[in-house]
């Protein structure tokens, strides 16, 4: 990931104008693990949203694997990214089952072909992956995600974000919805 001279201002030209990113430069190499620390309103989430394409930047350039993604839409950038949001309600489809959410995550960035739903092999794979979490979700594959606790949902979101082995994993307070025991696990 490389961020070159990134600027982002909210509500420009108004009394509520707020410069969130001011000439941000950052270069990360494959395998780097970075934690961004700052107070409320420091621009941490804004930076992640800019990288993900949720909010376009005012100026600057965003490169992933030396590919300029600055003008790419959020859904096109998703090919490169895995993401866990601060809010455990974001990143999953509440009215769909656990296995359906996992299937969507597994197919992220792939061509959508007409085919049957979730295969038996996929279901078994999902059970094994969920078992690792130790939350009992492997026995609730058809349960609606909206019925899960915040911590269960956040753990599921983390699993979904890593199913495709993304080039870049964006974590915005990934343990926010988890209780201390779930966070430790």
What is the predicted function of each stretch?
Residues 52:
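Helix-to-loop junction immediately C-terminal to a conserved catalytic motif
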Residues 161-167:
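A short, proline-enriched helix->beta-strand linker immediately N-terminal to the Walker B motif
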Residues 37-39:
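The feature captures the beta-strand-to-loop junction immediately N-terminal to the Walker
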Residues 87, 95-111:
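Q-loop/switch helix immediately C-terminal to the Walker
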Residues 60-68:
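Conserved ABC transporter NBD signature motif
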């Amino acid at each position: 990931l490389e961020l070159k001279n990134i600027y982002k201002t909210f509500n420009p030209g108004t009394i509520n104008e707020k410069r969130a990113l001011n000439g941000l430069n950052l270069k990360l190499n494959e395998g780097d693990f970075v934690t961004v620390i700052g107070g409320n309103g420091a621009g941490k989430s804004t930076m992640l949203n800019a990288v993900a394409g949720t909010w376009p930047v005012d100026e600057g350039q965003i490169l992933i694997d030396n590919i300029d993604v600055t003008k790419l839409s959020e859904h096109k950038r998703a090919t490169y990214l895995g993401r866990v949001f601060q809010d455990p309600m974001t990143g999953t489809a509440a009215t769909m089952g656990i296995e359906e959410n996992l299937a969507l995550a597994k197919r992220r960035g792939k061509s959508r072909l007409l085919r049957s739903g979730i295969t038996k092999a996929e279901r078994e794979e999902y059970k094994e992956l969920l078992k690792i979490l130790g939350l009992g979700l492997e026995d609730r594959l058809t349960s609606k995600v909206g019925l899960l606790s915040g911590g269960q949902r956040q753990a599921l979101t983390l699993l979904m974000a890593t199913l495709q082995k993304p080039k870049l994993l964006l974590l915005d307070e990934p343990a926010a919805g988890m209780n201390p025991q779930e966070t430790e696990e």
